[in-house]
From Swiss-Prot:
This is Endonuclease MutS2. GO terms for molecular function: ATP binding; ATP hydrolysis activity; ATP-dependent DNA damage sensor activity; endonuclease activity; mismatched DNA binding; ribosomal large subunit binding; rRNA binding. NCBIfam families: mutS2. Belongs to the DNA mismatch repair MutS family. MutS2 subfamily. Residues 704-779 form the Smr domain. Keywords: ATP-binding, DNA-binding, Endonuclease, Hydrolase, Nuclease, Nucleotide-binding, RNA-binding, rRNA-binding. One of its GO terms (biological process) is mismatch repair. Its EC number is 3.1.-.-, 3.6.4.-. Endonuclease that is involved in the suppression of homologous recombination and thus may have a key role in the control of bacterial genetic diversity. Acts as a ribosome collision sensor, splitting the ribosome into its 2 subunits. Detects stalled/collided 70S ribosomes which it binds and splits by an ATP-hydrolysis driven conformational change. Acts upstream of the ribosome quality control system (RQC), a ribosome-associated complex that mediates the extraction of incompletely synthesized nascent chains from stalled ribosomes and their subsequent degradation. Probably generates substrates for RQC. The keyword Protein biosynthesis does not apply. It comes from Streptococcus pyogenes serotype M49 (strain NZ131). The gene is mutS2. ATP binds at residues 328-335. PROSITE patterns: DNA_MISMATCH_REPAIR_2, SMR.
Length: 779
């Protein structure tokens, strides 16, 4: 397809109409590169994709895709063994997450028979291990502390050191308030300093980092915090080094998968592009045209896409029709009709919806040529006629029977008689070459050519004689006629002058009467057709309204079912919580053994009435909802005991799940994690007691870490931990108390000695913590 036609018809402006619908940079790049195609199967595939997307919107009301940055350059850098920065890794993380979401979305689609999009969905690949590792990068482009143990250690030390510096400086603010110009802690060159009055600079020993512009304030780093600030500076350098190491490791993880990730990114961008095409079609009442294989071109109620309130027109370019000649005066909309045909064909061949009604057809041209407007070349000193003729000669040399040719004011710019003769000769050459042509002209001689010549048809633009203005309605089959006499009469020209003028053109009066009759018949036919279309539109509106009501009803029904299920679940949860509270109180106040409490709990559960709910439609629906939320590979999760995010990577034969949490792999049962919804992620509060379940030959086992706790806090957590361990039938537990001053260790020992359910306890082996940990046997 020649590029000149794209400029002449302003095709790039048409493409810009789709920009507001795009969410990904990849789809924007695809739109920028979009050009008309010349192969029918490729065009058909594009149309099928839009039809598939329409089905998705009908069934699901939406097709969610997040904004994605282009990762093309980042992937190229990976291929060159370069390391990516945090923002580049975050962009790739979003692509991985969006790929996983799209795979899950596709697996949940029902009642849709795809023609093309299924292949795109099925070519998407998941990377659960990578997703799990990349949870260490949050959405703000920050590395979480759990990205590595070393980073966590550095940041913990950094936090402690900064807290100590703040505390020392806060104390000095109180003690040295009279020496300070402001009661605040300032920062200079990354160091925490105090703003000291210049007259008292010798009263506070330390390092001077800055002096105010007025010279009245000196910013001093007190000697008491110099060492700590140096430690903070070193820790920040260590933090940057460790972050760089982690980014290098993440880059290495991505390198083997560059090709697949690039393919995923392209698919996501293309799906976004198809979504944009559908939304453009829906908002502009456009349609997907059929593709004819016999050069037939039918446009029903076609509109110019770049006009604000375009008039819709019908155009029928049958397979045996070679040329349509639009005659009549200027300013009637002839050029707009010419451009509308060209743009509709360009849009259709680019795989875009056409601004026309259903039933429209396009054909596939290898080239579209146009001579529109004044393309006079001042540099070449050519006249308007010469400029047009040079262009027309070029078109005639290049056009073939697989081309569409558009001429605006063919033969204009020279002697009318010679111009008309040239126009007819050019049209005749194109007709004999079987090249489809639409031409506009104001030469009356071409009316006769259109009437007398086979496979050529006249057309004109309607003119309202009452208002003396064009209506821009296209009248195919009706040649244009001059309205000069009617206009002159209405503008007040003397009747005898108008009569004399008519007598002078008596030879053309019969032709004009025939044209007038044809116009009247065309108008009547159009009125009837408009009425039929109005009825059709009413029927369509009714059908849409019924469908919309049905969809709303289905949606509301599903919401009610979900609400009923949630309410029922809340009631059950409330009852179970109350029973747990009662049992806890009993355990605190009695001599009941843990296994007796568990038996009692089971008896309480048995009190619930056994009702056959197999035929209950509401609960059956609820079960389906619950089943639809079963964990799947690639799901994001919250590990309950840690409060940290991870990603499911695989399911074991025994039903347990493997998950990637930062750089750590974990094996979890389903009750040890909760799913994070894609569109409604819930914030999870980190629990203060970290319990890590392990497999042990003596039965379930748990661990409690009391290091860094205050004595009272540690004893409360120990008491709660032992209670929970007994209720969960733990056979053996580990308590990590550290060595330190020995206060917490002694408190743990005293507590265990007096607890009636502790069978035995002893320090851990030397290789498992030694005297810093105690192993407890419960019973």
């Amino acid at each position: 397809m020649n590029n000149k036609i794209l400029e002449q018809l302003e095709f790039n402006k048409v493409k810009e109409l789709l920009l507001p619908y795009l969410k990904t940079e990849q789809s924007q790049e695809e739109l920028l590169e979009l050009e008309p195609m010349t192969e029918a199967p490729k065009i058909e595939k594009s149309f099928n994709e839009i039809s598939d997307m329409e089905q998705i919107f009908v069934e699901h009301h939406s097709f969610g895709i997040v904004s994605l940055s282009s990762i093309s350059e980042s992937l190229k850098r990976l291929e060159l063994s370069a390391d990516l920065n945090i923002q580049e890794l975050l962009a790739i993380k979003k692509v991985l997450q969006s790929s996983s979401d799209m795979i899950h979305f596709y697996s949940d689609l029902n009642n849709i028979s795809f023609q093309s999009l299924d292949r795109l969905f099925e070519n998407l690949e998941q990377f659960p291990n990578l997703q799990g590792s990349f949870q260490a990068i949050n959405d703000g482009g920050f590395l979480e502390h759990f990205a590595s143990p070393e980073l966590e250690r550095i940041r913990r030390q950094l936090t402690n050191s900064e807290r100590r510096v703040r505390q020392i400086l806060q104390d000095m603010l109180k003690e040295k308030a009279e020496l300070l110009s402001e009661n605040l802690i300032a920062s200079r060159s990354g160091r925490s300093v105090l703003p000291v009055k210049n007259t008292y600079r010798n009263r506070i020993s330390g390092v001077v980092h800055d002096i105010s512009s007025s010279g009245t304030t000196v910013y001093i780093e007190p000697r008491a915090v110099v060492t700590l600030n140096e430690e903070i500076t070193q820790l920040r350098a260590d933090e940057r080094h460790e972050e760089g190491r982690i980014l290098h490791a993440f880059s290495d993880l991505l390198r083997p998968h560059v090709a697949t990730i690039r393919n995923n990114a392209w698919i996501l961008g293309h799906l976004d592009f198809v979504r944009a095409k559908y939304l453009f079609m829906s908002d502009n009442k456009a349609t997907i045209p059929k593709i004819s294989n016999d050069s037939t071109l039918v446009l029903i109620n076609v509109r110019h896409p770049l006009l604000s309130n375009p008039v819709a027109n019908d155009l029928h370019f049958d397979h045996d029709l070679t040329a349509i000649v639009i005659t009549g005066p200027n300013t009637g909309g002839k050029t707009i009709m010419l451009k509308t045909l060209g743009l509709a064909q360009l849009m259709g061949q680019s795989g875009l919806p056409v601004l026309a009604d259903k039933g429209s057809k396009i054909t596939v041209f290898n080239n579209i040529f146009a001579d529109i407007g004044d393309e006079q070349s001042i540099e070449q000193s050519l006249s308007t006629f010469s400029s047009h003729m040079t262009h027309i000669v070029s078109i005639l040399n290049e056009a073939d029977r697989n081309s569409l040719v558009l001429f605006d004011e063919l033969g204009a710019g020279t002697d009318p008689q010679e111009g008309a003769s040239l126009a007819m000769a050019i049209l005749e050459h194109l007709r004999l070459s079987h090249i489809k042509t639409m031409a506009t002209t104001h030469y009356p001689e071409l009316k006769a050519y259109g009437i007398e010549t086979n496979f050529v048809e006249n057309a004109s633009m309607e003119f309202d004689a009452e208002t003396l203005s064009p209506t821009y309605r296209f009248m195919q089959g009706v040649p244009g006629r001059s309205n000069a006499f009617e206009i002159a009469s209405r503008l007040g020209l003397a009747p005898f002058i108008v009569k004399q003028a008519k007598q002078m053109t008596d030879s053309d009066s019969d032709v004009n009467r025939i044209i007038e009759q044809l116009e009247a018949q065309t108008l009547e036919t159009r009125r009837r057709l408009d009425h039929i279309k109005e009825v059709e539109q009413e029927n369509l509106k009714f059908n849409r309204a019924v469908k919309k009501l049905y969809n709303e009803f289905s949606h509301e029904r599903d919401k009610e079912l979900e609400k009923i299920y949630q309410e029922a679940q809340e009631i059950v949860d409330m009852a179970l919580n109350e029973s747990d509270t009662i049992l806890k109180k009993l355990n605190d106040k009695s001599q009941l053994k843990p296994h007796e409490i568990i038996d009692a709990k089971a008896q309480i559960k048995k009190l619930a009435p056994q009702v056959d709910l197999s035929k209950n439609k509401v609960l059956n629906k609820a079960k389906k909802i619950k089943a639809a939320r079963a964990p799947r590979i690639g799901d994001d999760i919250i590990v309950t005991s840690y409060g940290q995010r991870g990603t499911l990577t695989s399911q074991l034969k025994d039903g347990r799940w493997e998950a990637q949490v930062g750089i750590i792999k974990m094996t979890l049962t389903q009750d040890e994690f909760s799913l994070v919804r894609v569109q409604e992620e819930q914030k999870v509060k980190n629990k203060q007691i970290n319990v890590v379940k392990k497999a042990d030959s003596s039965g379930p086992r748990a661990r409690l870490d009391l290091r860094g706790k205050r004595y009272e806090e540690a004893m409360q957590e120990l008491d709660h931990f032992i209670d929970q361990s007994l209720l969960n039938n733990m056979g053996q537990v580990d308590i990590i108390h550290g060595i330190g001053t020995g206060v917490i260790r002694e408190g743990v020992t005293k507590y265990l000695r007096r607890h009636k359910h502790v069978k035995h306890f002893a320090y851990a082996p030397q290789n498992a913590g030694g005297s810093g940990a105690t192993i407890v046997t419960l019973g």
